[in-house]
Amino acid sequence: MTNVPISRLRNFCIIAHIDHGKSTLADRLLQDTGTVSSRDMQEQFLDNMDLERERGITIKLQAARMNYKADDGEEYVLNLIDTPGHVDFSYEVSRSLQACEGALLVVDASQGVEAQTLANVYLALENDLEIIPVLNKVDLPGADPEKIKNEIESIIGLDTSKAISCSAKTGVGIPEILQAVVDRIPSPKDNTDQATKALIFDSYYDPYRGVIVYFRIMSGGISKKDKVLLMSSKKSYELDEIGVMAPDQVKVNSLHAGEVGYLAASIKAVADARVGDTITLVDRPAQDALPGYAEAKPMVFCGLFPTDADQYPDLRDALDKLQLSDAALKYEPETSSAMGFGFRCGFLGLLHMEIVQERLEREYDLDLIVTAPSVIYKVKMIDGEIRMIDNPATLPDPQKRETIEEPYVRMEIYAPNDYNGTLMGLCQDRRGDFIDMKYITTDRVTLIYEIPLAEVVTDFFDQMKSRTKGYASMEYHLIGYRENDLVRLDVLINSERADPLTTIVHKDNAYGVGKGLVEKLKELIPKQQFKIPLQASIGSRIIASEGISALRKDVLSKCYGGDISRKKKLLKKQAKGKKRMKSMGKVDVPQEAFMAVLKLNKD
C-alpha cells in the first residue's frame, strides 16, 4: 500500500471559515475517490467528536489518505489533512500547514472572504503553500462567484483565473478539484536518503493503545522495527504499529519521506508526544529538530469548580484525561472560600474554554461552575519584581504594586458597511483604540482596532454577532502589554469576600460593574433570618452597596392583648438573637446566584 513513488504523492489541507462547507467538501472528496463507500458515509465524516458535529465546527485535526486515478492514467495518493477554522485553534492550523505542500482555499460563493480565512491564508503563504481557490455553494440562489473572485484577488492577491466553482452538497466540481490537486500542488521533496525527521501534527489518546501520533515524514523513513526518539522530550520508544489513515487506520510495515501516517508506541500522555515535535530514529538520529514550533500558550483563564464537592477527584481525573488529548489545556488546583476546591485552567480562547467545559460535562458527567474568564496581567511591584497574575483574587494590594499592564490585541473586523457605526460604538465601549478603516469592496469594510484582551474574552464575539445580525467576522492576535489604570473589584457578601466574583476592571468602569453585581446578587440570594449587606469595594473603599432585608418571624402571634412590656420583651429577645446570628451566621449563597452573576459579567 505504501510503495508509491514520491512524485505521485500530494499532501494538502483545506482552509475555510466556519460554515463555508469545509467538512462537507472533505466528505465529497472521500466519497469521489472511493475511500469511503456511500454506505458508510455519514455527514462530516472527519469530524468524529459529537460536539464537532453539533456545533458544525472542526476542533481536532483529522487526516485521510485517498487513492485517485488522474487523467494521465496514473494512480496518485492524496493525503488530506483537515484543519479547524476557528481563531482559537490557529495553532492546530499552523502545524497542519507545515505538513502540507498545498491548500484548497474554500470560500462561500454567497458570503465572500471572512476574517479567519484570511488569518489562515497568511499562515499558508508564510509556509510557501500552493493555494487553489475554490468557490463553494455555487448552487445557492445568492451565490455570486464573479464578485467573490474579485474579492479574493483584491484582498488576498491570489490569481483567481483558475479558481474552481463547486458545490460540495450536490457534488458539482469535485472531479475538477481532485485533478487540480494533482496538477497544481507540488509533490514532496525526495529526502529519503537523509536522516529521518517526521513532524507530529496531531495526537490523541486511545485508552487501549496509549497515545496515537499522527505525523508527516519530512526526510528519511520509518519502519515497524525501528526504535524512535522524540527530540524535545528526549524519550525513546519501541513501535507497536505504524500505518496510514484511509481514513480508518490500516497497518503498514514502513513509510518513507513525504508520507503521512500514524504510530502507536505505548506512549503514556500526549504531553510526551508534543505536537510540533520531531520524531527521529534512535540508531541514526537527526542532528537538529524541525524548525518553527512554538508551544501553545493559554490566553484565557478561569476557575472550574464542581457543584458537588465530592466530585473534585472526578474532575481532577477528567482534566488529566482531557490533557492527554489536548496539549493546550493547562490547569492547577485552586481553593476558594465560596466554592471549595477546584482548578484554575488556562485556554487558548473562549471557544476552547466552552468546548473543554462541555466535554467535561458531557463525556465525564460532571456538573461544573465556571468563574468569569480573565487574562494574564503583568504587575510591577514596588521592589521592581515583575509578577504575572492570572487570577484576579491574587492581585497584590495597591500599596505593594507600582503598575499593572494588560495584554492588548490587534483586531480586524470584517463586516458589511451598514454596521460600521454600531461596531465602532462597541469597540469604543470596550476601550478600543481606532487604528484604521479600509473598504474592501464598495459594500464591505475592515475595521482595525487595538483593544484590551480582557474586553474581548467576555462576550465581545456574541455582541458583535448580535449587532450585525451575524454578518461580521473577526480575527485578532496579541501585540503586547500596555499599562492602564486598573483596579481589583471585590464583592463582599456579609462582609466576606467572594473570591469567584473578584474581577479586574478599568477604574472608570468600576462603579458601573460593581453596582450591577450587587444589584444582581440582591435579586438572587434568598432572604436569611438576618440582614445581609452586599458591597462592591476597591481596596477598603466601598463603591456600591445593597442590602437583603431579614426574614421576620412574627414572635407576637401568641400574645393576644396583654401587657405591652411582654411584647417588648419578646421583640428585644428576637433582636438579640438576630444580632448574634448576624455575627455568627454564614450566608449560604446558592450556586445559581454565582452562575447568574458570572453571566451578568458578560452583559
From Swiss-Prot:
Keywords: Cell inner membrane, Cell membrane, GTP-binding, Hydrolase, Membrane, Nucleotide-binding, Protein biosynthesis. One of its GO terms (cellular component) is plasma membrane. GO terms for biological process: positive regulation of translation; translation. GTP binds at residues 19-24, 136-139. It is an enzyme of class 3 (hydrolase). It is found in: Cell inner membrane. The keyword ATP-binding does not apply. Pfam families: EFG_C, GTP_EFTU, GTP_EFTU_D2, LepA_C. One of its GO terms (molecular function) is GTPase activity. It catalyses: GTP + H2O = GDP + phosphate + H(+). InterPro entries: EF-4 (IPR006297), EFG_III/V (IPR035647), EFG_V-like (IPR000640), EFTu-like_2 (IPR004161), G_TR_CS (IPR031157), GUFP (IPR027518), LepA_C_sf (IPR038363), LepA_CTD (IPR013842). Its EC number is 3.6.5.n1. It comes from the Bacteria. It is a peripheral membrane protein. Residues 7-189 form the tr-type G domain. Belongs to the TRAFAC class translation factor GTPase superfamily. Classic translation factor GTPase family. LepA subfamily. Required for accurate and efficient protein synthesis under certain stress conditions. May act as a fidelity factor of the translation reaction, by catalyzing a one-codon backward translocation of tRNAs on improperly translocated ribosomes. Back-translocation proceeds from a post-translocation (POST) complex to a pre-translocation (PRE) complex, thus giving elongation factor G a second chance to translocate the tRNAs correctly. Binds to ribosomes in a GTP-dependent manner. This is Elongation factor 4. It comes from Prochlorococcus marinus (strain NATL2A).
